[in-house]
């Protein structure tokens, strides 16, 4: 039986900032873009969450909810450095590490003989070493597969471990909300609710044919996950070809100036996503896509020099967006 651990750092960016500046401890802290530039919150600590602040919220709204919020500009180089240190700790227990982002990863510790081969004890040891050596906390989920390990890591946050043993899987998934299943967003959840499904137990009662009829191939996957079955291996390499962010506006942007004003918010979200991906990812070009009111679209791109020019250059994105906007009349 496999022993999979999903490790997830608690409020990673904010925790690193509090480590660097202990005076921030106990105060509401968020990392994100400037409110004046329509920035968004990348993450916030638990003190800020008490006021309703959360990631992906506009910085302006966050400051309305919590006027005393300390908003810090992201330091991606620092976060990547801490992420490398985090992975060095993981390597003490296994080489089978699948990074999902800077602050989370899957570990297959099935062959690890440390701590009597106990996945729970290994997870607790990792948490202790991270706290003692890096000055931040992580939460861990231990289970026979990746799906359940990821669900479990969120169960005892912050700074906790939750274990789903093989013998407990059946009882655990019966009451698990279908919203916890990967790939089930609001739209899919509503479609399932119309079928009378709110929990994995409800999902188990539906015939596979019904699920395939309504959800195609994903219906088979839903059926497996509802039973707590996930055979995906921990992959030590993940190839990412691109990273992007886009937004569809309720009203068409009126002109070139409006398009350029929309860039900072998109760049803040892109920065947040970029900072979370593997430290091995290297950006080689920037691109901007603009879709017009008639549903035609155009894309402009520009390579990033090998000289080390930062991948994020606001002026470049402004210029590309403006040039793309002017193409609509051609």
Where are these regions (language model features)?
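DNA-contacting surface of Y-family translesion DNA polymerases
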Residues: 6, 180, 193-329
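Gly/Gly-Pro- and Ser/Thr-rich, intrinsically disordered tail segments characteristic of DNA damage-repair
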Residues: 1-214, 218-221
């Amino acid at each position: 039986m496999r022993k999979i651990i999903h490790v997830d750092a608690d409020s990673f960016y904010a925790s690193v900032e509090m480590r660097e500046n202990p005076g921030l401890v106990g105060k509401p802290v968020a990392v994100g873009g400037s409110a004046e530039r329509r920035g968004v919150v990348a993450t916030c600590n638990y003190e800020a969450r008490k006021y309703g602040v959360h990631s992906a919220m506009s910085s302006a709204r966050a400051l309305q909810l919590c006027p005393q919020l300390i908003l810090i500009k992201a330091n991606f180089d620092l976060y990547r450095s801490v992420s490398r240190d985090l992975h060095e700790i993981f390597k003490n227990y296994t080489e089978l590490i699948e990074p999902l982002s800077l602050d989370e990863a899957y570990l297959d510790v099935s062959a690890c003989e440390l701590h009597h081969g106990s996945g729970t004890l290994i997870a607790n040891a990792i948490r202790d070493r991270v706290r003692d050596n890096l000055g931040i906390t992580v939460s861990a989920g231990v289970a026979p597969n990746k799906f359940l390990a990821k669900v479990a890591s969120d169960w005892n946050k912050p700074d906790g471990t939750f274990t789903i043993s093989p013998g407990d899987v059946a009882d655990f998934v019966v009451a698990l909300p279908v919203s916890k299943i990967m790939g089930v967003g609001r739209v899919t959840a509503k479609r399932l609710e119309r079928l009378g499904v709110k929990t994995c137990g409800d999902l188990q009662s539906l015939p596979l044919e019904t699920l395939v009829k309504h959800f195609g191939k994903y219906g088979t996957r839903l059926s497996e996950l509802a039973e707590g079955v996930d055979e995906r291996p921990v992959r030590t390499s993940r190839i990412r070809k691109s990273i992007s962010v886009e937004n569809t506006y309720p009203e068409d942007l009126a002109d070139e100036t409006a398009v350029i004003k929309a860039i900072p918010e998109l760049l803040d979200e892109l920065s947040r996503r970029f900072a979370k991906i593997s430290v091995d990812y290297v950006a080689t070009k920037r691109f901007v896509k603009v879709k017009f009111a008639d549903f035609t679209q155009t894309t402009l791109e520009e390579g990033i020099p090998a000289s080390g020019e930062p991948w994020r250059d606001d002026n470049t994105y402004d210029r590309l967006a403006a040039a793309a906007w002017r193409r609509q009349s051609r």
